[in-house]
Amino acid sequence: MKNARIVILYYKLSFLILFLLLKSALLLATEDVIYNLKFKQLSAPYSLPTNEVQKVYQDKDGFIWFATRNGLCQYNGYETTLYKSNLYSPDLLTTNSITCLVDDNNNHLWIGTSEGLNVMDKRTGEIKKYKAPYLSNNVVSALCVTRDNTVWVGTDNGLCRYVAEKDTFVVCGDDFGDSRLRYVTIKSLLEDSDGDLWIGTWAQGL
């Protein structure tokens, strides 16, 4: 009986030592990954039009987009392509101050700015523009495309939903939904796994 207890104790100690060794190895491997992270800076004037980047977004095709205060950049892993209004293309965007980005299932990139909404056809590069009164406000600070491909637009003066069949926007509180959102500044939008839309606001909570 005594020998049986010794054998059991031996196996318990062996298991404990093995567990501690594996845990230590895992921690060391994790630290090694953390300490060996490599950063590469993309900065103006070589890759970006400005160092003020307001949003980084990866679209469904894998391209990385940078929303900056001086234009929109597309990064393909090797080089950047700049989209901005300038002397040669004065009306390419409603403004070069880009605030947010999202793409839908129809190859459209939705571009929020401080002076309206721009929608780029990624196949042709053509850009369509929307401003108030189509929107509740020209300052677009949040965008979200839900699983049913509905586009939601958060502005400094309420929440809008795009109606593709009519190529127009309806305003939450005026045309549908809770009237308490009508004049609220929307800062962030997220659809969760249950299909609920989370709406982050300025000074009005969630």
Which residue ranges define each predicted feature?
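Carboxylate-rich, polar loop motifs that coordinate divalent cations or form catalytic acidic clusters
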Residues: 1-206
